[in-house]
Amino acid sequence: MDGLKSFLSTAPVMIMALLTFTAGILIEFNRFYPDLLFHP
């Protein structure tokens, strides 16, 4: 379990988790409000 915690706290894993989270939020936001992301 300690090795898993040290693996999950490394920088590439944290970056991938953050990017996945951000992409999910953008996809859901774009699903409900499709015109707001491309406003000039």
Swiss-Prot record:
GO cellular component, one term: photosystem I
Annotated membrane topology: Single-pass membrane protein
Keyword Transmembrane listed: yes
Purpose of the protein: May help in the organization of the PsaE and PsaF subunits.
Family per similarity comment: Belongs to the PsaJ family.
HAMAP family from the UniProt entry: PSI_PsaJ
Record's protein name: Photosystem I reaction center subunit IX
Organism the protein comes from: Synechocystis sp. (strain ATCC 27184 / PCC 6803 / Kazusa)
Lineage: Bacteria, Bacillati, Cyanobacteriota, Cyanophyceae, Synechococcales
